[in-house]
């Protein structure tokens, strides 16, 4: 299961990580699924958009349903591609490294949909930079959680200029 992070999103992630180096933040995120022809299980996703709605503290952040509801209409208007995406979450672990804690895994399990998939991305400014996972319920109501390997998270990086080397 892969995740692609486009350059524009990568730059936005870095901005928030630099602005809040010791504080966790979170918000809804929209993911475009990618399928092999004729298959219903995605081979990967692209992180299309995210909107931080909560600035937590050093060890936690919380998203309330009302926070997400308030931004949905504007998000769909400003980013029409999000209407065809699956919604999930993104949050930071600032300088602790990106990984799925027990709380993060419970969030994935609690939000596993009966149809489609719930995606979650964790980002960090130190150590492991990205972690990605999905959850879903199968036809028998059993919840599944799939974590991507770090090498399956692809960032579209900016071209390094001579100015950046100085």
Predicted feature descriptions by range:
Residues 1-87, 95-166:
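Conserved beta-strand-loop surface patch within small alpha/beta domains used
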